Amino acid sequence: MLLKSTTRHIRIFAGTVENNELVPDDQALTLDIDPDNELNWNDTAVEQVYRKFDELVESYSGSDLTEYNLRCMGSDLEHFVRSLLQSGEISYNLGSRVNNYSLGLPRVDVDAEAK
């Protein structure tokens, strides 16, 4: 059985991708960041998410691989993505096929618009 955690912007699978197919593997975790491209990402922000993921994996080292643990990790990463959005390191992709502001409404810099 494939263990997984799915949030709006983070998907974690207990498995690997081989020939474009997800193959269950309880010795490897695969992270999919923002699969619907709802956010605008830069390399630095993506690296921050991967580092946070690595930290979470390390913190669960020695624990059983369970759906509950994956969901906890997914939730923590989703909150981390929200913090990146709130700090302005990433932004909503207004050209996305779906505009779902699940992390909060977009902020507009009123001073910049007045100039």
From Swiss-Prot:
Role this protein plays: NDH-1 shuttles electrons from an unknown electron donor, via FMN and iron-sulfur (Fe-S) centers, to quinones in the respiratory and/or the photosynthetic chain. The immediate electron acceptor for the enzyme in this species is believed to be plastoquinone. Couples the redox reaction to proton translocation, and thus conserves the redox energy in a proton gradient. Cyanobacterial NDH-1 also plays a role in inorganic carbon-concentration.
Enzyme class, UniProt record, top EC level: translocase
Family annotation (Pfam families): NdhM (PF10664)
Protein name: NAD(P)H-quinone oxidoreductase subunit M
Family named by the database record: Belongs to the complex I NdhM subunit family.
Complex and partners: NDH-1 can be composed of about 15 different subunits; different subcomplexes with different compositions have been identified which probably have different functions.
Catalytic activity as recorded in UniProt: a plastoquinone + NADH + (n+1) H(+)(in) = a plastoquinol + NAD(+) + n H(+)(out); a plastoquinone + NADPH + (n+1) H(+)(in) = a plastoquinol + NADP(+) + n H(+)(out)
Principal subcellular localisation of the protein: membrane
Cellular compartment(s): Cellular thylakoid membrane
Protein topology in the membrane: Peripheral membrane protein
EC id: 7.1.1.-
GO terms for MF: oxidoreductase activity, acting on NAD(P)H, quinone or similar compound as acceptor; quinone binding
Organism name: Trichodesmium erythraeum (strain IMS101)
GO CC, alphabetical: plasma membrane-derived thylakoid membrane
Keywords per UniProt: Membrane, NAD, NADP, Plastoquinone, Quinone, Thylakoid, Translocase, Transport
